[in-house]
């Protein structure tokens, strides 16, 4: 049975990684990213029913003497 020739595998694998890196860099460079996303996104706070009502829990150990 002939022996498998693996002398070109390193070159093939390295060139594959280089090609994948270049392809992904080109794909990522075409995306538009916001410079400061904190200024563009506004979080609207919605009050839940238990936040609108006045509620307070008194623990016995926190009561003044």
Curated annotation (Swiss-Prot):
N6-succinyllysine: residues carrying this PTM: 53
Annotated S-S bridges: none
Entry's Gene Ontology BP terms: proton motive force-driven ATP synthesis
Topology with respect to the bilayer: Single-pass membrane protein
Parts forming coiled coils: none
Subcellular location: Mitochondrion membrane
Protein name: ATP synthase F(0) complex subunit 8
Species whose genome carries this gene: Capra ibex ibex
């Amino acid at each position: 049975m002939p022996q498998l020739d693996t002398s070109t595998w390193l070159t093939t694998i390295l060139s594959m990684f280089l090609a994948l890196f270049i392809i992904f860099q080109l794909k990522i460079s075409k995306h538009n990213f916001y410079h400061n996303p904190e200024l563009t996104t506004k979080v609207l706070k919605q009050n839940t029913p238990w936040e609108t009502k006045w509620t307070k829990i008194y623990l016995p150990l926190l009561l003044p003497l």
